[in-house]
């Protein structure tokens, strides 16, 4: 069952390329050339399939979390970057949120199959994996606050995700936010396994 879910998510990852291409077309960048991963990330992704699931699960979880973090930061910057292009901004946000909805499910699926040891390992991997990945992207310094992204990865919380995205995606039941009390506060921030 886990392998089938993984294959389904891999198909979604490939469909994201179509959505990214549509974003580029929104900016009339029809001739974008996709480049391979940098040296370190290329090596890491070649090694991933060779490890047993128990060893692969924490770094796989972190890569999904990293994607979601990047998309959240891009989404947060769209209003400023595309302030004078509301149609383009709205179209890019629509496409980006489709990807984010899938990524949210991928994070949930990966989280669902990790026990406390795997989750602890994933927490240790967040900073080095984020830094290694973004070191290979020269645009990082111009587009992102890497320290902020690392912090967001380490403190990821489903309650920070837009409710309409959670409604469309899949989130483990033990990670869903609890209802608010009469005074508006949450009984508990997040249920965790």
Predicted regions mapped to residue ranges:
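Non-heme di-metal
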Residues: 1-193
């Amino acid at each position: 069952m886990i392998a089938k879910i993984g294959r389904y998510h891999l198909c979604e990852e490939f469909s994201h390329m179509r959505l990214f291409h549509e974003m580029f077309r929104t900016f009339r960048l029809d001739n974008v050339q996709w480049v391979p991963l940098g040296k370190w990330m290329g090596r890491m992704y070649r090694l991933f399939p060779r490890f047993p699931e128990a060893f692969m699960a924490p770094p796989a979880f972190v890569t999904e979390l990293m994607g979601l973090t990047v998309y959240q930061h891009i989404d947060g910057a769209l209003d400023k970057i595309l302030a004078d292009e509301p149609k383009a901004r709205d179209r890019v946000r629509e496409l980006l949120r489709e990807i984010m909805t899938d990524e949210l499910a991928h994070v949930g699926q990966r989280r669902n199959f990790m026990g406390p040891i795997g989750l602890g390992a994933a927490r240790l991997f967040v900073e080095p994996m984020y830094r290694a990945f973004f070191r290979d992207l020269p645009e990082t310094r111009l587009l992102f606050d890497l320290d902020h992204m690392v912090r967001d990865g380490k403190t990821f919380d489903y309650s920070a995700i837009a409710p309409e995205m959670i409604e469309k995606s899949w989130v483990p039941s033990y990670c869903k936010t609890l209802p608010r009390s009469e005074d508006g506060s949450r009984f508990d921030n997040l249920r965790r396994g």
